[in-house]
Amino acid sequence: MTAAVLGATAASAQNFEQYGSEAGWNIAIKEDMGPGCLMMKTNEDGTQIQMGIDATGELKGYMALYMKTPANLAKGDDFEVLFDVDGDQFEGEAIGQEIEGYKGAYVLVNNPDFIYDLAKKKQLTITPKGHRQVLVNLDGTNAAFETLRACQDAQAQ
């Protein structure tokens, strides 16, 4: 996986069109992503996770994390991030962003199938350098990823 730039916004501050929900994930269309589709949920600790497809040009995978809790992260800050998917590790570069009380970041990956392939995995661990680790349990997400793919396929028509 080649990771490109990271930056995130609060779900409440973004314009989404609800597409559906599966396995605790909301699936939505985001017009300014091509339109692209993403699936999102909030962990018990308040961390919000988004994964999907950016279709603004050549299709890319998209992952975003953001939180309301104070973080040592400022808009425009560059930092490294490590993704661990069931023991396979990938590195990327992140750019911080702050919107309406949320701080976070997103990453674009050159292979959109990387996002869909997460359905076959058990856990995604995201570790931004200098920030706390975020665990994403992927067990049982296959239905959500199938709905995400159906959403994205519908946008291409």
Residue ranges of each PLM-predicted region?
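Sec-dependent signal peptide recognition
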Residues: 1-2
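N-terminal signal peptide c-region/cleavage motif recognized by signal peptidases
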Residues: 8-10
